[in-house]
Amino acid sequence: MAAGNTYSEEVLKATNWLQDNAQKEAFSYVFKTQKVNLNGKEIAWNNYNKDTTDAEMINLQRGAETSWDQATDMEWESEIDSLTKRQVLIFDSLVKKCLFEGILQKNLSPSDCYWFIQHEHGQDTGYHCHVLLGGKGLQQAMGKWFRKQLNNLWSRWLIMQCKVPLTPVERIKLRELAEDGEWVSLLTYTHKQTKKQYTKMTHFGNMIAYYFLNKKRKTTEREHGYYLSSDSGFMTNFLKEGERHLVSHLFTEANKPETVETTVTTAQEAKRGRIQTKKEVSIKCTIRDLVNKRCTSIEDWMMTDPDSYIEMMAQTGGENLIKNTLEITTLTLARTKTAYDLILEKAKPSMLPTFNISNTRTCKIFSMHNWNYIKVCHAITCVLNRQGGKRNTILFHGPASTGKSIIAQHIANLVGNVGCYNAANVNFPFNDCTNKNLIWIEEAGNFSNQVNQFKAICSGQTIRIDQKGKGSKQIEPTPVIMTTNEDITKVRIGCEERPEHTQPIRDRMLNINLTRKLPGDFGLLEETEWPLICAWLVKKGYQATMASYMHHWGNVPDWSEKWEEPKMQTPINTPTDSQISTSVKTSPADNNYAATPIQEDLDLALALEPWSEPTTPTFTNLHLTPTPPDSAIRTPSPTWSEIETDIRACFGENCAPTTNLE
C-alpha cells in the first residue's frame, strides 16, 4: 500500500470484486477430518500426505504453495513447520479436485461457478476448510445433493492420500466413517414449524468480507487462525494479512448506510410481523414466471420451466403445491387478460405489412358463403374481448366438414387457458371451466337438465357451479365458443320438447351457420393467422368493442344476422384486400364525370361503411371533375356483380345462378 490514502491495485481490485459479488447466493460447506483408531492404528489430520504421481494434483499443490509464499509477511519468520505446510497444500488440492468433479457430475461448467476456499485451524475443531460455492444453475434445493457428492469424493481422496498402511477392510471402514460421520457438512437452518433442516444460502461477497478476511493468520503452532485462502477470481490468493483486513474495512465503509432510520414498533405490530421464507419467495417468483410464459397446464410447465417444476415436486406435498400454483396462475390470467388479449399478443408486427387478410383460410371459408368476412371477424373479436354483452357465445353450426372445428380449435389453442364442457359428466359438466379465459364446447347436443346453467354461462353471467369432491366455485363472465351439427335451440327434457328455451338460447348466440363443404386438401389454419387478423382489424380501425362494431355495421348482431351485407366486391384484375369496396350506383347523367375521393387512399374501414357520417365521403358529396374525352378514358374492369347483372338481363331472371369465383 502506498503512502497517504492511495491503495494498492490488488486491494482495490479485491474490494471491487467483492462489491460485484456481494449479494450473490452461495452454499457454505466445511471439509474436515477426525482422529480415527483402526485396530490400534492412529490416523490424524496430518497423516494424509502420501506422495502422488497425479500431474493435476501436483500442479494444484504448486499453485497453492505459490499463494502461501507470496501471502506470507516477510517481516517475521513463520514458525509453521514444513510438514504442516505440505499437509495444507495437499488438502487444498484435494478440496479443489472434489469441487471440480462435483460440478462436472451436475453437467455444469466450472467457468459459470464462483468459489472461495480458506483452510483454518480452530481451538476446538482442529483443522477444517471452509468452501463457498455458487453459480449459474446452482439452486437452494441442490445444496444437500452437492453435500452428499462432495462427502463421497472427499472420503475417496482421503483414503488414496492416507500414508498409514491399511488393509482393504480397514480402508472400507475408514471410508464408511468419513461418509457416515459427514466429514463434509452444509450450513442449514431448522424450520420453526416442520423442525426439518433446510439449506441456508449465504451472500458470497458479504460472507468473505465480513467473516473470512477479518481472521488472523496462523503463524505459530500455539495460535489459531487461517493457513491459506484462494478464490475463483484470484483476488485474495496473494493478499497479506494486513491487506485482507484493509479490503474488509473498505468494503464495510462502502456498504455502511449514510443515515440511520429509527422506527418505533408497538408490541401488537411486532406480534403481527412475519419473516418471509425462502420458499414463499421461490413460489412467488415461479408464479410470476408462469404467468409471463402463459403456462396453464402441468405439461406446459414441464416443457417451459422443468427446473422449477422438479424443485416443487421434490418438496413435501409437492403435488398439492404444483396444483395450487397452477390455480393461482390460471386465476391471474383469467382476471387480468381476455381471450382476445392472449391472441393479439401473439401477432408478429414484422408480418403485418405484407399480410393479406383475404388470403387467410378463415376468410376463404367465409367468402365461400359470400359473406363480408371483415364483418364476421370483427364480431368474433368483440365476443372474445367480452364486449358482446348478453351475446357471449360464438356458435359455429352446420353440416360436417364445413370448417367449424378448424376455426374453433385454432382459436382455443391460441388462447391456451381454455376449459372444456364435458357432456359425459352428467352431474358436473362445467367442472373444468373455472378460472379460464375461454370455454370450448365441441359437438354440442341437447343440454336437457343443464339448460338453465348453460344459458347463464352462455350469456356471460357470474354464477356458482358444483365441482366433484369440492364445494361450489364461482365462474366469472367467460366467452364461449361452440361447434355443433344439431339444432341446439331445441331442448328436450326426457320425451318433452321445451320451446320456451329456443328464443333465450338464440339471444345468447353469435350465429355463424357454415354450409359449404371444404375440399379434402383444405388444411388447417396457420398458427399466425388469427393473431394477424386481430392486429389487422386494429390497424384498420376495427376495435374489439361493441361501440366500434355498431359504428361500422349499424347494429349489434342477432340470430338472423345477414353476414353478406354490406357486400364485398373485388375487381377482376385487383384481387388484393386493399381495394375491396362497396359498389356505387351511378345514373346515366353521371357518365361524363369521374368521382375523385377527397383523400388519396380511402381507408378500408371507411369504404365498407354501410351508411355515412356527415364527414364521410359519399358519392353525393365527392368533388366531381370533368373527365377527358371518351377516347382518353381507360374503361375500368367490370366487377363480378355487374357481369352477373348483364347475364341476367340477357337471359332472363330464370337463368341458373352464376358460379361464385370469389
Curated annotation (Swiss-Prot):
Gene Ontology biological process: DNA replication; symbiont-mediated arrest of host cell cycle during G2/M transition; symbiont-mediated perturbation of host apoptosis; symbiont-mediated perturbation of host cell cycle G1/S transition checkpoint; viral DNA genome replication
InterPro entries reported for this sequence: Helicase_SF3_DNA-vir, P-loop_NTPase, Parvovirus_NS1_C, Parvovirus_NS1_helicase, Parvovirus_NS1_N, PV_NS1-NUC
CC cofactor: Mg(2+)
Region (Ori-binding): 192-196
Active site feature: 211 (for nuclease activity)
Primary subcellular site in the record, as a coarse category: host cell
Binding sites annotated in the UniProt record for ATP: 398-405
Protein name in the entry: Initiator protein NS1
Species annotation: Porcine parvovirus (strain Kresse)
Top-level taxonomy: Viruses, Monodnaviria, Shotokuvirae, Cossaviricota, Quintoviricetes
